[in-house]
């Protein structure tokens, strides 16, 4: 625990006073607030989502809970609705892959809009935001697999946006990733890839405002964040594992540093990923797509590219920084009496370093991201799309006519490419 501040405001957990629920409830009354949870059906079989539900039930003044659900059948969607049936606020279960949703969104292709993002968190977040920001001033996003969810999580994520005159538009979480079972350090993607990568790039490129910005976040891959409607409506949403870095890049594009905050949520644990057997699996795939997201941000914000001659230097720097971090994490674990698999960590850094050269080559061949357009762009030519999408996401009978009845009028506002 410290009190250091950096480029962005850091809200520490000083643990000296209990959270004040009255303060949060008053803020929720003053500013309509929605919590968004992207979710797979498998999460309903695990205890984490039940824990999250029990905590959120206490937020009586919450405007709405949006569940962006990928499900295989109407029966599964109804099961999800029943799961949240007793909440003291409205719950909208957006069936993201419903037939009506697919029919609605695919109809925009003739206007040059590809809204059928690959299935995953990015597409779910984009849909959930579209539904949430219709009438909410603040939106907070939490993953469905958080095993350590406490009342402090929504309180600390939301208060910076709800307090009068705070001026904050975007909040991102940071935390200590420890296994609940073994107490070992987790978060290899952040500790052993993103951290060493940003440091190595800074050493290679020198002065870099964008890299300084990313390094100001203590946990840049945190999937928990909150923002105002005015910001959310302007964000393009990445559709791969570069979602978190890509969103940070979008926030950097739209918001001054003084309007960004990060919040300490303390101990945090959720579902873990394996390293993967190939670069297209597990953490290896995730880190490859994160690398592309960082490189794209450097291009967009600074016009900076990594030349073929610099690749070898970046590989060497990454490996050295990664090995230095392992030494530091080993000592940190030893003093805190935590188990630490140093050999496993060394192997992970070696594997991550092998992703850099092919990852750079793939990025240079195709530097454009798979991004869903911002809602401000869509609403400029399809002003009723949010309502149509929400209606389609509620279709439970397989009869798409009622769910997409408004779509032709909405689409007609967009000029055809033909």
What spans do the regions from the language model cover?
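A recurrent flexible, glycine/aromatic-enriched loop bordering the glycosyltransferase active site
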Residues: 181-191, 202-224
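N-proximal low-complexity "stem/linker" segments adjacent to membrane-targeting elements
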Residues: 1-57
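Short, acidic, metal-binding catalytic loop of nucleotide-sugar glycosyltransferases
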Residues: 51-63, 82-83
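Conserved donor-nucleotide/metal-binding helix-loop-beta segment in metal-dependent transferases, i.e.
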Residues: 147-179
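Active-site-proximal specificity loops/subdomain of glycosyltransferases
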Residues: 15, 76-136
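Short beta-strand-to-loop acidic/aromatic patch adjacent to the donor-nucleotide binding site
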Residues: 135-147
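Catalytic donor-sugar/metal-binding loop of nucleotide-sugar-dependent glycosyltransferases
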Residues: 239, 248-268, 277
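Terminal low-complexity segments of carbohydrate-biosynthetic enzymes
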Residues: 1-13, 88, 271, 275-418
């Amino acid at each position: 625990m410290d009190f250091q501040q950096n480029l962005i405001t850091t809200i520490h957990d000083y643990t000296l006073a209990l959270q004040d629920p009255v303060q949060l409830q008053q803020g929720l009354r003053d500013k309509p607030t929605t919590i968004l949870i992207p979710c797979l059906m498998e999460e309903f079989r695990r205890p984490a989502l039940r824990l999250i539900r029990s905590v959120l039930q206490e937020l009586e003044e919450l405007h709405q809970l949006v569940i962006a659900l990928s499900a295989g059948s109407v029966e599964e969607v109804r099961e999800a609705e029943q799961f949240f049936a007793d909440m003291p606020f409205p719950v909208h279960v957006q069936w993201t892959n419903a037939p009506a949703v697919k029919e609605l969104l695919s109809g925009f292709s003739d206007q040059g809009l590809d809204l059928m993002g690959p299935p995953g968190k990015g597409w779910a977040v984009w849909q959930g935001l579209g539904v949430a920001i219709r009438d909410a001033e603040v939106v907070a996003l939490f993953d469905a697999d958080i095993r350590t969810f406490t009342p402090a999580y929504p309180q600390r994520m939301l208060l910076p946006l709800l307090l009068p005159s705070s001026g904050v538009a975007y909040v991102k979480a940071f935390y200590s990733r420890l296994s609940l079972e073994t107490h070992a350090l987790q978060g290899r993607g952040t500790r052993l890839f993103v951290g060493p990568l940003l440091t190595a790039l800074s050493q290679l490129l020198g002065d870099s405002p964008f890299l300084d910005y990313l390094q100001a976040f203590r946990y840049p891959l945190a999937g928990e964040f909150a923002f105002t409607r005015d910001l959310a409506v302007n964000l393009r949403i990445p559709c791969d594992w570069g979602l978190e870095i890509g969103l940070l890049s979008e926030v950097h594009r739209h918001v001054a540093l003084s309007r960004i905050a990060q919040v300490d949520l303390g101990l945090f644990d959720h579902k873990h990923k394996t390293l993967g057997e190939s670069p297209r699996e597990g953490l290896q795939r995730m880190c490859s797509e994160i690398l592309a997201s960082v490189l794209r941000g450097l291009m967009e914000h600074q016009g900076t590219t990594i030349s073929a001659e610099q690749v070898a230097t970046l590989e060497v720097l990454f490996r050295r920084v990664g090995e230095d971090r392992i030494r530091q994490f080993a000592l940190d674990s030893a003093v805190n009496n935590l188990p630490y698999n140093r050999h496993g960590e060394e192997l992970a850094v070696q594997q991550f370093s092998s992703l850099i050269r092919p990852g750079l080559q793939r990025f240079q061949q195709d530097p454009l991201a798979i991004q869903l357009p911002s809602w401000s762009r869509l609403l400029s030519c399809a002003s009723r799309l949010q309502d149509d999408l929400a209606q389609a996401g509620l279709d439970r009978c397989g009869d798409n006519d009622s769910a997409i009845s408004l779509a032709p009028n909405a689409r007609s506002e967009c000029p055809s490419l033909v």
